[in-house]
Curated annotation (Swiss-Prot):
Transit peptide: 1-27
Gene this chain is encoded by: ZDS1
Source species of the chain: Arabidopsis thaliana (Mouse-ear cress)
Name this polypeptide is given: Zeta-carotene desaturase, chloroplastic/chromoplastic
Molecular functions (GO terms): 9,9'-di-cis-zeta-carotene desaturase activity
Deletion consequences: Albino seedling due to defect in pigmentation, growth arrest shortly after germination, altered leaf development, and seedling lethality.
Amino acid sequence: MASSVVFAATGSLSVPPLKSRRFYVNSSLDSDVSDMSVNAPKGLFPPEPVPYKGPKLKVAIIGAGLAGMSTAVELLDQGHEVDIYDSRTFIGGKVGSFVDRRGNHIEMGLHVFFGCYNNLFRLMKKVGAEKNLLVKDHTHTFINKDGTIGELDFRFPVGAPIHGIRAFLVTNQLKPYDKLRNSLALALSPVVKALVDPDGAMRDIRNLDSISFSDWFLSKGGTRASIQRMWDPVAYALGFIDCDNMSARCMLTIFSLFATKTEASLLRMLKGSPDVYLSGPIKQYITDRGGRIHLRWGCREILYDKSADGETYVTGLAISKATNKKIVKADVYVAACDVPGIKRLLPKEWRESRFFNDIYELEGVPVVTVQLRYNGWVTELQDIELARQLKRAVGLDNLLYTPDADFSCFADLALASPADYYIEGQGTLLQCVLTPGDPYMRMPNDKIIEKVAMQVTELFPSSRGLEVTWSSVVKIAQSLYREAPGKDPFRPDQKTPIKNFFLAGSYTKQDYIDSMEGATLSGRQASSYICDAGEELAELNKKLSSSATAVPDELSLV
């Protein structure tokens, strides 16, 4: 979708320059993957799996998103046979991207890698993708109306927890009174306990799932202004909902890691598009080890039966591609779906089980991702003339938050992920995440572009006079699951009551939040359950094979 939007230019601005101080921070993934797990919650940082010595299993995975691919990598490493099926034309799921007819890379969302993404970094190192991450300055930057900038600046010679305490005490995003009350609330949180007892702190944090972060924060002395100016943008960026509607568990999980690990708050972004620099290397790793990925093959139905003792088991997957249909049979079946996907897939009869019925208590959050290409550099606040030239990229190279627009977080991908997004002779490519996305789902794309572009000029007055030369809009009706108070108990374990059927996905039970890290961790947990049950699963398949009636592999479309 192309568009042309122009706003009148204004005079020069007087904006305080950003500090250029730099302090050494350990940004090596080699050390991060090992160091992050030291004195940390065991649920977030599971040990390396022991070598599998049981029978080789044939595994069919539904879904080629990060959870499905994580599961596949772990199972292939243990010697199993893996096939992945996905109805899409590209891999990656919510972390996927594709190229349009004009050569533009379109993403499903804005993907930022927090320093505490230990399991995802481990996966990226395994597949050789760690070199595809670009480390950003160790600051969290807030863009306020009229171009004023607030920061949580973690750049300090002394690490956790001192660097974090200092960042909150000196931030210019909050007024002195709000900073004081903010510090008081955090001092009274399980975050402090995490410094000496990380597993105990995580248990305390889980127990706070039933209340919203706002209710918890205000009860500990925090202020509404702190929520509005700082924590709401962060909450929207993490889970696409605000602090009033987000469980305290989610925010405090992040805080506990930020407080105890110096690098946890350090941000990274991919060199370029996820399809090339994240999903691509994982796919290569899978296929190099004999795994197979079948795109455009969607699962229409889970086939199942019951044994004489009334136990349910899966007998196959009915899948289709255009007019072709077939039955896939395996020893093990894994549904690596998102919330709406798993609800569509599960047989209605399975809802008689509380385990499966609980999943229907979860719902996804709508989100809209907008890309805007400009003929200049929107985030260059110091020099308007420099912002108008197109010989070199200038501006803010980091994830940006804002409390003053409908998009809570955004970035200039031409700066932050230049390999695929910087185009010679063109300027900024803003990628903005509209949260909550509900008001925009029915809005025409051109109206969305116009509204977002107007809000950009309110944040960056220096961008007035620049033209939007190209744009795209991606709407996802149900993205991350809504991590509202009281929903955590409804998240299912990866191991289900059906012996040969497992789940994976960031919505499933794991100690991190719904995210890329959560998806990766869920895949590790699913693989671990499968390997633990290897002997039993192989025996079950022998029993099913001996008693099953012949079913043709290929079915014609009726």
